[in-house]
Regions:
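Bacterial N-terminal signal peptides that target proteins for export
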Residues: 1-11
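Bacterial N-terminal signal peptides
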Residues: 10-20
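Immediate post-signal-peptide N-terminus of mature secreted/exported proteins
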Residues: 24-74, 153
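Non-transmembrane, amphipathic alpha-helical segments
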Residues: 39-54, 71-78, 99, 106, ...
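Short, solvent-exposed, charged loop/turn and helix-capping segments
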Residues: 89-108
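Helix-rich interaction surfaces within compact, conserved domain-sized segments
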Residues: 96, 107-155
Length: 155
């Protein structure tokens, strides 16, 4: 996996996630594909240190730019640079995070939203909406994952 670029890893992850969601919905036509995270029988999912680290990296990247994003003074090239930063943090998560199968599936729901936001920031339109998607996802993370050291994004 060392030889794959970050972008390739993200594309493969996204494709596998979308395909598995599609295949799951083919087998059960009564249940829509999962787009929201779920709790673990009413409890938050256990994490490992790399999940905390990776999510913290994403949060810190967003934190330093949130005022400019909020004030609509963040420039298109800055969004693209931020998307590249988020890419690096996602790669770290994909390479290092070791969760239980069920917790990992729930994490993928959240990370898919981060990927969507990152891709919007990379595009020439709706860049701010992409950043907002990531900010909202960071706000959801502690609702579903038991990260006792998590500090919320300040904005």
């Amino acid at each position: 996996m060392r030889f794959l670029t970050q972008q390739t890893i993200v594309i493969v992850f996204t494709s596998v996630f979308m395909l598995s969601t599609s295949l799951a919905s083919e087998h059960n036509h009564d249940t829509p594909p999962q787009t929201d995270s779920l709790l673990n029988e009413g409890k938050k999912w256990k994490i490992d240190s790399s999940l905390h680290e990776g999510m913290n990296r994403i949060k810190h990247s967003m934190q330093s730019k949130v005022s400019a994003i909020h004030d609509k003074t963040f420039e298109p090239e800055q969004y693209k640079a931020l998307a590249a930063e988020i890419d690096m943090h996602l790669t770290y998560l994909f390479e290092n995070c070791k969760l239980s199968k069920d917790a990992d599936a729930q994490l993928h729901v959240l990370l898919f939203k981060v990927i969507e936001g990152k891709e919007q920031m990379r595009a020439s339109t709706e860049q701010r909406a992409g950043a907002v998607t990531i900010i909202k996802t960071l706000q959801l993370y502690p609702k579903y994952f038991d990260d006792k050291n998590w500090q919320p994004l300040q904005h």
